[in-house]
Amino acid sequence: MSNQDMIYIKSKENEYYYVRNDEHKYEVVELLYNIKKNIFILRDHLYHNKNRYNIEHHPSIDQLYNNLHNVSISETPPNTNNSSYTINKGQEIVFCVRSKKDGNLHDINLMMYVAIHEISHVACPELQHTPLFKKIFTFFCDEAIKLNIYTKIDFDNNPQECCGININNSIV
């Protein structure tokens, strides 16, 4: 499979997603749609309730809200070694939604952890996994748990493979 085997598929909600053109393409579109819906629920909740949070969180909430508007969400191409990543602080988020071990789709909860990680990069003015990034990621995970769009996974005691990466510690 090459990048030529990627295709735009329209979701039931009339949004297009760039996914692998295989037997799982409609499942992937549904998964990506649900990820996008949930990150917008989190983004909007944080922004509209900003004054409830410590002022130290206001810059990251504003940056997330301002940068994450017309985000393009897609699946990683089959011939890449990349996992999930963000381009231009929210212009595009590309998700690896399949296990590198067996090719099965990851479940929505694990993908929400990955999505929260990626939008934490969007909200953080610094690059890499700095202390500020980790603070933002922790805050976003805590809020996503409260909103019931993510259920905490105890990676410390139950490591999980996600796109070939072993996640073995929890931010929350």
Language-model regions: role of each:
Residues 1-112, 122-172:
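Active-site-proximal or metal-binding-adjacent scaffold patches in catalytic folds
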Residues 118:
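Walker B catalytic acidic pair
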